[in-house]
Amino acid sequence: MFFQHVYDKTLAQASYFIGCQKAGVAAVIDPKRDIDTYIEIAKQNNMQITHIFETHIHADFLTGSRELAAVTGAKMYLSDEGGPGWEYEFAHEGMKHNAEVMVGNLKIQVLHTPGHTPESISFLLTDTPASKEPVMLFTGDFVFVGDIGRPDLLEKAAGMVGTQEKGAEAMYNSIHLFSDLP
């Protein structure tokens, strides 16, 4: 398994490049707008980007998912959770809770983790040749090191009245999903 964390300090935005070296395929999770970084990582490691995942609809930065898909031919795997008003309005592969996608030998399992946003999903990664147990969890803005995402932003920053309490309750319930993880 190949893994590289890509961090944009100016935006405080993290993305991830994961790949199956045996199959020569890779995925990018939450790509930043400047996609050249991922193209270069793929080139340096003899991999083709075939999958693009997003943890949620990003309001705080411009994502590079659509451009990266156009340049590489990769499929976009995006949340199909959240209900009306939280749908992506362009072609993608919709992902629901417990859906699984293989990137070579790497298994990506979807966990619906609403709270920060209603459609938020996390990705549980298992390196199947090495282990039956997951080795990484990509949570987007749902969980941070030592903190959790803010369920109040939709109400405070976007003016979506009545979402703060619902978001906090959803986040509380979502956190309990993690108690079942190894």
What are these regions (language model features)?
Residues 1-48, 122-140, 146, 150:
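Conserved beta-strand hairpin/beta-sheet module of binuclear metal-dependent hydrolase folds
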Residues 24, 107, 117-182:
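Metallo-beta-lactamase
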Residues 25, 65, 69-70, 74-76, ...:
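Hydrophobic, small-residue-rich alpha-helical packing segments that form membrane-like cores
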Residues 28-29, 49-58, 77-80, 112-115, ...:
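Active-site neighborhood of phospho(di)ester-bond hydrolases with catalytic His/Asp-centered motifs
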Residues 33-77:
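Active-site metal-binding motif and surrounding structural segment of the metallo-beta-lactamase
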Residues 36, 57-62, 83-86, 118-119, ...:
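Active-site environment of divalent metal-dependent phosphoester hydrolases
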Residues 61, 66-67, 73-76, 80, ...:
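Metal-associated gating/positioning segment near the N- to mid-region
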